[in-house]
């Protein structure tokens, strides 16, 4: 096992140079360096994720508003909502976050591009949290799932004009007039497709279309689409 001194300061610099040049590097040292490097990167990602999370809980209007709305719904509950319900961790899948009604919110520290990506992701998952408290969502019910995904993508800010344009641009079918709705629908279909009760992407699209009008129009707890 490595001492902490091996992974810091001059000794880490020496090991890095040795790894890059290969001079005097044994196979065991190479493997150990790669393992230590990965551990250092995971720790760095985790600390940055929690730093961004705490900043958003303090300063983001959307996040603060959603936390207040959740706290109001949660009055009288034995399970108080606080920052312990929002954790950062490594995710093997290509997703930026997740929500579980019993465990809370997961932020995928290795998938978040920057502070603002975390804000969109956290806002998205907080809307799921709100929906679950307000309507006791059955997450295996495809219509329930689709409705919350539509609301989360629409209200979180992840489908605002500039974010969607950065992802797609004009050459990938982006349309200014309906860009927001197209983005919401696309992302909802992707999420519902991952539900174990969903048969196919076409099945997910059908479910999303069935609940679209009422769910897209429902902006609670906001008065309108804020971001």
Swiss-Prot record:
Keyword Cell wall biogenesis/degradation: no
Source organism, top-level taxon: Eukaryota
Active site per database record: 125
Cysteines joined through disulfide linkages: none
UniProt similarity note: Belongs to the peptidase M76 family.
Free-text function comment from the UniProt entry: Has a dual role in the assembly of mitochondrial ATPase. Acts as a protease that removes the N-terminal 10 residues of mitochondrial ATPase CF(0) subunit 6 (ATP6) at the intermembrane space side. Also involved in the correct assembly of the membrane-embedded ATPase CF(0) particle, probably mediating association of ATP6 with the subunit 9 ring.
Assembly notes: Interacts with ATP6.
Protein name, entry field: Mitochondrial inner membrane protease ATP23
């Amino acid at each position: 096992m490595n001492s902490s001194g091996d992974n810091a300061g001059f000794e880490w610099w020496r090991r890095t140079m040795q790894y890059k040049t290969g001079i005097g590097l044994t196979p065991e040292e190479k493997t150990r360096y790669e393992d230590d490097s990965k551990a250092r990167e995971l720790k760095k990602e985790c600390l940055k994720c929690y730093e961004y999370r705490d900043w958003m809980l303090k300063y983001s209007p959307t996040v603060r508003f959603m936390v207040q709305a959740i706290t109001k719904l949660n009055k009288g509950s034995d399970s108080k909502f606080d920052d312990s319900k929002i954790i950062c961790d490594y995710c093997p899948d290509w997703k930026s976050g997740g929500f579980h009604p019993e465990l809370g919110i997961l932020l995928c520290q290795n998938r978040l591009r920057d502070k603002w990506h975390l804000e969109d992701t956290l806002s998205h998952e907080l809307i799921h949290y709100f929906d679950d408290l307000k309507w006791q969502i059955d997450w295996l019910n495809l219509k329930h799932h689709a409705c919350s995904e539509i609301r989360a993508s629409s209200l979180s800010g992840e489908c605002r004009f500039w974010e969607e344009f950065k992802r797609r641009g004009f050459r990938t079918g982006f349309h200014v007039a309906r860009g927001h709705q197209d983005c919401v629908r696309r992302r909802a279909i992707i999420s519902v497709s991952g539900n174990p009760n969903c048969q196919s992407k076409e099945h997910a699209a059908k479910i999303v279309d069935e609940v679209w009008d009422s769910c897209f129009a429902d902006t609670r707890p906001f008065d309108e689409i804020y971001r």
